[in-house]
Amino acid sequence: MRSTSYFFVFLALAAVFISPPISFSDDLNNEVYLLSKNNKLLAFSGLQNKWSEKDLGTGETVVKSDYDGNVAVAYTQDRALAFSGITGRWSEERFRIHETVESIKAQGNVGTIITNIRALAFSAKKGIWVESVFDIHD
């Protein structure tokens, strides 16, 4: 009986060392691709297995874009745009007067656009923008 117990302990320890590592958001597969072409933004969702397009206005051009994981973000002179590979939908947030973009980033399920007056965050899971306005009186 005693040797059987040792055998099961050995099997349990071997399973711990052989099992695959836990995957964190940094290891998230890229499921989205973003392309700017012919006055449109085109996003491909690997999860939905389809392309989705967003028309740009007359004279509107993409200044900068980024994509990673399940999210793609871009901005033009007029608005912030984001695509969720999970929902397969676009969302937009118009810029305010005298608002200038300082940074743009896509990582995992989150896209961010930081401006001189607020931080915009887009969740690929929810498919919506959330803002935090900076207190300019500090």
Regions found by a protein language model. Give the residues of each.
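Bacterial N-terminal signal peptides that target proteins for export
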Residues: 1-9
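Structural motif
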Residues: 38-44, 78-84, 118-123
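N-terminal, post-signal-peptide region of Sec/Tat-exported proteins
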Residues: 44-79
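A short beta-strand motif characteristic of beta-propeller blades
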Residues: 49-56, 89-94, 128-133
